[in-house]
Amino acid sequence: PEIKAGDIIESIDGVEITKDTDWHVLLKNKGGDKIFITVKKGVGKAKGMYIEAGFTDYTQLYDRWVEQREQMVEKLSGGRIGYVHVEGMDSESFRRVYSKLLGKYRTCDAVIVDTRHNGGGWLHDDLATLLSGTGYIRFEPRGQYIGTEPYSKWTKPSCVLIGEDNYSDASGFPYVYKTLGIGKLIGAPVPGTM
């Protein structure tokens, strides 16, 4: 059951919610836990349900921000250009970028790699290697393009979005990208904090 705008949460884990209740305390340190709430939907009787408490709104806000940019790039390019955001210079972010580049965006003509708002890590060489693939054979059985070798590298044009809040390795990666001549940098200068 979904909670919607207009529904009223009447209790959390058996504690009644009133106008004076500090409900934040009832959720403190419960991220990822199942909690029992009672919810009144409209004029009907309140119903109890278990939900999983979230950790913060950051993840949802970040996912929405990325999704909005993906949709904008897809719409403006007619689906010809892909968009990936590198959240951090770490292996989890790299796996997401790798998966999108060589999965969802494999048939795109180009990709925008957004490194803005990235706190750093140690990924510059991995990203540079991934984005600097040089295709040496195209697979097009009966005129249908299915891929290029190397299959595990991006072999098409790319550009990198940068910003003044790129920190540490996120400040170093644009230098590597530019020095190797992989593609264009777009945005505000990075602070040089690597």
Please provide the spans of the model-predicted regions.
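Cleft-lining beta-strand/loop regions that shape enzyme active-site pockets
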Residues: V15-M194
